[in-house]
Amino acid sequence: MPTDYLLSQLDVLEAESIHIMREVAAEFERPALLFSGGKDSIVMLALAEKAFRPANIPFPVMHVDTGHNFTEVIDFRDRRAAELGVRLIVASVQDSIDAGRVVEESGRWASRNKLQTTTLLDAIEDNRFDALFGGARRDEEKARAKERVFSFRDEFGQWDPKNQRPELWNLYNTRIRRGEHIRVFPISNWTELDIWDYIERENLEIPSIYYAHEREVFERDGILLADNQFVQRGDDEPLFTTTVRYRTVGDMTCTGAVSSTASTVAEVIAEVAATRITERGQTRADDRASEAAMEDRKREGYF
């Protein structure tokens, strides 16, 4: 008697992501996976485990470290990489500043976020990477929504939205010339809710700041920023302590928290399911510089 074989949404997304990772491992000589210790890159690393175990993950992981990251996330990054036995490459924005490759911003709105582009491109060149896995998703932001899964970057590391390759079904064009590379986004079709559902299903450990906790914050442009030594707080920005969590993590100078009491994965899932604002739209000050802030950065070589 025939039986129906049904795959859940997560099973379909997982299979697609694993296929993409195996395709890259087979077609490129020197791939790497961007791993910041955030929830999306944690899911990416879990998918890489599934794609290649019982063998070792056949590429290193890399983090572009601004030096202004949350301690909880950096500690998790180092511990997780050590547990898996993967090679962790840390590309430092501070090293780029010291070498005169970039100039640090000053003033109230200063951030190292944009400076990461130069550090990233230098690391790609130094390590001769020809493919780089990223954890970007189409539901995050409109520039990422129109980017291909296999995103071509020219010899300068730049992205041209008008020069994207057709992607038919699960067929990907991996051909590049010397000096060019491909940014690959295996979880491009996932949503924030899918990520959390997968974290729950796979029982993945994530940094504690993704759950509700008390933190001293101040409000700037509608965003709750953590009090820290890297941000110049104005006299009109009083500090207060409240219960928050982070939907996304990045540079402390431009990543905001959200008011929340969600202290478990199930509670976070319920909260995400009810929200009508994207995580970057609600919490990322770096995306508010202009209407096309993300696309402008990506054109220059950003993640």
Protein language model features and the residues they cover:
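Nucleotide-activated chemistry modules centered on ATP-dependent adenylation/adenylyltransferase
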Residues: 1-303
